[in-house]
């Protein structure tokens, strides 16, 4: 790293991993530039289930209370066959009485993390509409090349963290073990909370091993705090 200067890291991608990492680095008094391809952060994606290990990270970030306020507590998983019999009936308390999960919309999670990042505005800077194509490493820095607002982007950093998703083209090729798409797919939708089912359970309905439907409680989204999903 450059001597007599505070370290300056780049994080490529403003998803949950990138934003959480930015917060942790800023806590260590490290300058962070978030490089995001999108022109602005928008609600995208569907719900996800935070496991106890993930919740421990948000507690460390000081964000657990906000995650619990916006998300939905999930105490277990039930998987039902067409006959009505349960294929899966698993509950967190079977592992530990204090364990649980939290269902939450991906955009809500990013909203919580983004707000926390704004608290470190003297250390975290945002460069939106920035598309990175190439990284060039030297002995003491990483050169980041791409475009920003349609113009050439070229900047050196002490370190670069690649957090732009599972389909990132920036990872070393030797890290990519599988480069073929899955031979199956899924459809997602966001609907109001289903009160006919236990709202603390991740419900799954199985038709053999080829078809499954799931209903995950995900709490609320910031712009509609009274509508649970």
Placement of each model-derived feature along the sequence:
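Beta1/beta-strand and adjacent pyrophosphate-binding region of the FAD-binding site
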Residues: 2-17
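Short, well-ordered alpha-helix to beta-strand connector turns
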Residues: 29, 74, 157-158
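Active-site-adjacent segment of FAD-dependent monooxygenases/related oxidoreductases
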Residues: 46, 50-116
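Conserved FAD-binding catalytic core of PHBH/FMO-like flavoproteins
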Residues: 114-115, 119, 125-229
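Conserved Rossmann-like nucleotide-cofactor binding loop
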Residues: 17, 40, 167
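Glycine-rich FAD pyrophosphate-binding loop
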Residues: 10, 26-46
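Conserved H-loop
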Residues: 31, 64-65, 123
């Amino acid at each position: 790293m450059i001597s007599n200067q505070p370290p300056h890291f780049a994080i490529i991608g403003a998803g949950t991993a990138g934003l959480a990492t930015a917060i942790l680095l800023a806590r260590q008094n490290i300058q962070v530039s978030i490089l995001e391809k999108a022109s602005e952060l928008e609600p995208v994606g569907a719900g996800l289930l935070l496991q106890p290990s993930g919740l421990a990270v948000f507690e460390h970030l000081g964000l657990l209370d906000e995650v619990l306020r916006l998300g939905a507590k999930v105490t277990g998983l039930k998987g039902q066959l067409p006959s009505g019999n349960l294929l899966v009936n698993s509950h967190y308390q079977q592992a530990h009485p204090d364990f649980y999960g939290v269902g939450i919309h991906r955009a809500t999670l990013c909203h919580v993390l983004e707000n926390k990042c704004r608290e470190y505005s003297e250390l975290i800077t945002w460069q939106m509409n920035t598309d990175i194509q190439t990284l060039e490493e030297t002995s003491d820095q990483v050169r980041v090349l791409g475009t920003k607002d349609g113009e050439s982007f070229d900047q050196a950093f002490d370190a670069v963290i690649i957090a732009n998703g599972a389909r990132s083209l920036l990872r070393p090729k030797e890290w990519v073990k599988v480069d073929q798409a899955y031979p199956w797919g899924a459809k997602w939708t966001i609907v109001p909370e289903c009160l006919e089912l236990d709202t603390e359970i991740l419900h799954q309905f199985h038709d053999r091993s080829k078809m499954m439907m799931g209903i995950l409680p995900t709490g609320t989204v910031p712009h509609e705090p009274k509508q649970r999903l």
